Amino acid sequence: MTCSVQPCEPDEQEDAGNRAVCPVLAIRQPIDHHSTVSEAPTDPRITVVVPTYNERENLPKLVGMLADLHLPNLGVLVVDDGSPDGTGDVAEQLGRDAAIPVSVLHRTTKDGLGRAYVAGIVRALDDGADIIVQMDADLSHPAEAIPRMVAELRNTDAAVVLGSRYVAGGAVAEDWPWHRKALSKWANVYVNTILRLKVRDATAGFKAWRSSTLRTIDVASVGSNGYAFQVEMNYRVIRHGLRIAEVPIRFEERVDGTSKMSLAVQLESAAVPWRLLRSNIGK
């Protein structure tokens, strides 16, 4: 409630000789809760989308790390592709027991990383997320980088923020296999040469997105799968005249389980940049 001053009526005033004091009436009026003049900024709703396939050992650790961030309005959406090791059941249990909200999107078809991410991102958008974070379940992405990525997104004009291995301050784990390091470096040179993305880590899978960016690039129509999905998402951002920012992270080797990198994924990753170059995205 607020107060306003009610002025004296003429008949309440006395002549100057009596020097009477005009009474001041404090009239209580309701606050306009829709006013934006003095409203404090609200914390954005953040959804971390985590695709899973046979990650029952890693998922509880990841959710615990995310809870330890104590970020307001942060929740997790697990997108499980029918993991035979029971990851989906573990995710459901986390939804009941975890310190932060955990929801699960169960898919019956294992049709690739890109399809899982699209399904999860579309669900998160439908649920009202303001910021959507892409994150692997294998603990290779450092959860502690998320506050910095979100801050970069909120305090600059960046459309998306990458957790980058290859900007100053970024690194990869010493125990990451040499052939994976070489393949990653080559893929970045290859993609940037063809598509001119002008980002250091074009194949990064750790990203914080504005919901408005994801709608602008029409994420539901992204056709690439596997790791090429990351490249197409970046390309759509650039083609729409938006800016990609990068913050340094240390990329770790997975803790448990096996890598999903296959020959088919590598072949798609080699072909997709040429397909994108011939597309009419952003035109």
Question: Can you describe what each PLM-predicted range is?
Answer:
Residues 3, 8, 18-43, 189, ...:
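Hydrophobic helical membrane-anchoring modules
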Residues 45-47, 75, 232:
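Cell-envelope/extracellular polymer assembly enzymes that use nucleotide-activated donors
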Residues 57-61, 85-94:
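Acidic helix N-cap motif at the loop->helix transition within catalytic regions
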Residues 64-73:
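Short, acidic, metal-binding catalytic loop of nucleotide-sugar glycosyltransferases
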Residues 73-83, 105:
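Short beta-strand/loop segment that forms part of the nucleotide-sugar
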Residues 80-89, 139:
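A conserved acidic beta->alpha catalytic loop
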Residues 107-126, 143-227, 254-268:
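Acceptor/aglycone-binding surface of glycosyltransferases and processive sugar-polymer synthases
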Residues 129-140:
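Short beta-strand-to-loop acidic/aromatic patch adjacent to the donor-nucleotide binding site
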